Swiss-Prot record:
Mg(2+) binds at D73. SUPFAM superfamilies: ITPase-like. It catalyses: XTP + H2O = XMP + diphosphate + H(+); dITP + H2O = dIMP + diphosphate + H(+); ITP + H2O = IMP + diphosphate + H(+). Pyrophosphatase that catalyzes the hydrolysis of nucleoside triphosphates to their monophosphate derivatives, with a high preference for the non-canonical purine nucleotides XTP (xanthosine triphosphate), dITP (deoxyinosine triphosphate) and ITP. Seems to function as a house-cleaning enzyme that removes non-canonical purine nucleotides from the nucleotide pool, thus preventing their incorporation into DNA/RNA and avoiding chromosomal lesions. Its EC number is 3.6.1.66. This is dITP/XTP pyrophosphatase. It comes from the Bacteria. Substrate binds at T11, G12, N13, A14, K15, K16, S74, F157, G158, Y159, D160, K180, H185, R186. It holds the Pfam family Ham1p_like. GO terms for molecular function: dITP diphosphatase activity; ITP diphosphatase activity; metal ion binding; nucleoside triphosphate diphosphatase activity; nucleotide binding; ribonucleoside triphosphate phosphatase activity; XTP diphosphatase activity. NCBIfam families: RdgB/HAM1 family non-canonical purine NTP pyrophosphatase (TIGR00042). Keywords: Hydrolase, Magnesium, Metal-binding, Nucleotide metabolism, Nucleotide-binding. Binds 1 Mg(2+) ion per subunit.
């Protein structure tokens, strides 16, 4: 592969961007953050599923920019809350991206719910669109755990301080980055996604 594959990472979330960049092969792919593109558009995330939101963000941004775009949608689904907060994870308490308020609301919603009924999972859906707005690749990853009764740890973001990994008896907020990267929903989705992406890059390079 002589030419770098130009790929826009279609997320405005700086912390998600860091995770994506850490796992994507930058020796093969020229990564550009959405924040680095002046004419990027804001895509309304009004889908009822993570996959619908990821596809919409990827295809609409790709058509607008006429570039390859990788978009991601992720969130937390709690068993006792019938899957909530789900696609509303980032704005569960009303304001988009207010992690503290979202965590506080989740704890209130689970008041008096025993630990054996506090099962939950993080979900991640990745979608790659070509410059014409066609979905070329899509992959998902999940990570099962439980919701703690109080926040622990200052690492990570979002609901990480509440999400307990049973095997480690620690929250994502307490685990070191290496362990979290091995276990997280985003990492699991990327491990499935990257080999497919590299095959597509190879094919694109060969046919160019």
């Amino acid at each position: 592969m002589n030419r770098m594959f130009d790929l826009v990472l279609g997320t405005g979330n700086a912390k998600k961007l860091v995770e994506l960049r850490m796992m994507l092969p930058e020796e093969t792919i020229a990564l550009t953050a959405l924040s680095e593109i002046e004419n990027a558009i804001d895509v309304v995330e009004d889908g009822e599923t993570f996959s619908a939101n990821a596809a919409k963000k990827a295809t609409e941004q790709a058509k607008h920019l006429e570039r390859w775009v990788l978009a991601e949608d992720s969130g937390l689904s709690v068993d006792a809350l019938k899957g909530a907060p789900g696609v509303y994870s980032a704005r569960y308490a009303g304001t988009h991206g207010d992690d503290e308020a979202n965590n506080e609301k989740l704890l209130r919603e689970l008041t008096d719910v025993p630990m054996d009924r506090r099962g939950a999972q993080f979900n991640c859906h990745l979608c790659l669109s070509d410059p014409d707005g066609n979905v070329r690749l899509a992959e998902s990853g999940i990570c099962r755990g439980r919701i703690a009764t109080e926040r622990s740890g200052g690492a990570g973001f979002g609901y990480d301080p509440l999400f307990v990994i049973p095997e480690y008896h620690k929250t994502f907020g307490e685990l070191n980055l290496t362990v979290k990267r091995a276990l997280s929903h985003r990492s699991r989705a990327l491990r499935l996604f990257i080999p497919q992406l590299l095959r597509l890059v190879q094919s694109n390079s060969t046919s160019a």
